[in-house]
């Protein structure tokens, strides 16, 4: 059977699917931290389609980042990608200590399902005009270094396109204004985002 890789335009991601995605992320991290059998993905066909995906874990209350890891490219079927990214966000984000099981009821889970990244091919000085705040996430790649910012980052910190691009350069460990250079590859993607309002609570589309 051929691999299924579909663009977001071809898939209507409902709140029901988003809720299942977030529940799967929480169940995967919880099971891993308890040394229990990992959950199986839901049976819905979309969980067998390949998508880029990120899992973000935030503290509750407080809403501060606790972990965020994922796959910008559609390497895995969505269900497997959610399971992997959730476990990695909980235990392997180098910015934080690995989560302990007693934290699981004090964090919220958010899942971002990504479209295929597309390179921004305009002249570098025009890149800000190609970035739509609130819709686009960004990826920078140069000489083995890379960085990614999800669309919600720009919204949360009220960035304009130039500020978002500067933050991307910093995230990638590159120099200030790196986005102004053609040798730095900048790509954009969109994400459909679902997250818990509170731990194990109602899931909303963001």
Swiss-Prot record:
Domain AMMECR1 stretches: 16-205
Designated name of the protein: Protein Ta0236
Organism name: Thermoplasma acidophilum (strain ATCC 25905 / DSM 1728 / JCM 9062 / NBRC 15155 / AMRC-C165)
């Amino acid at each position: 059977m051929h691999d299924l890789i579909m663009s977001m335009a071809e898939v209507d991601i409902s709140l029901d699917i988003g809720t299942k995605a977030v529940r799967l992320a929480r169940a995967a991290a919880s099971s891993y931290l308890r040394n229990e059998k990992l959950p199986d993905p839901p049976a819905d066909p979309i969980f067998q389609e390949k998508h880029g995906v990120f899992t973000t874990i935030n503290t509750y209350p407080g809403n501060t980042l606790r972990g965020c890891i994922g796959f910008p490219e559609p390497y895995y079927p969505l269900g497997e990608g959610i399971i992997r990214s959730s476990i990695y966000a909980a235990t392997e984000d180098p910015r934080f200590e690995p989560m302990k099981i007693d934290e699981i009821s004090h964090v919220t889970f958010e899942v971002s399902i990504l479209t295929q990244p597309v390179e921004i091919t305009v002249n570098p000085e025009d890149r800000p005009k190609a970035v739509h705040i609130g819709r686009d996430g960004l990826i920078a790649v140069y000489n083995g270094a890379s960085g990614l910012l999800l669309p919600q980052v720009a919204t949360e910190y009220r960035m304009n396109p130039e500020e978002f691009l500067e933050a991307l350069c910093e995230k990638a460990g590159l120099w200030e204004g790196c986005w102004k250079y053609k040798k730095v590859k900048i790509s954009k993607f969109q994400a459909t985002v679902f997250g818990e309002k509170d731990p194990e609570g109602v899931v909303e589309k963001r």
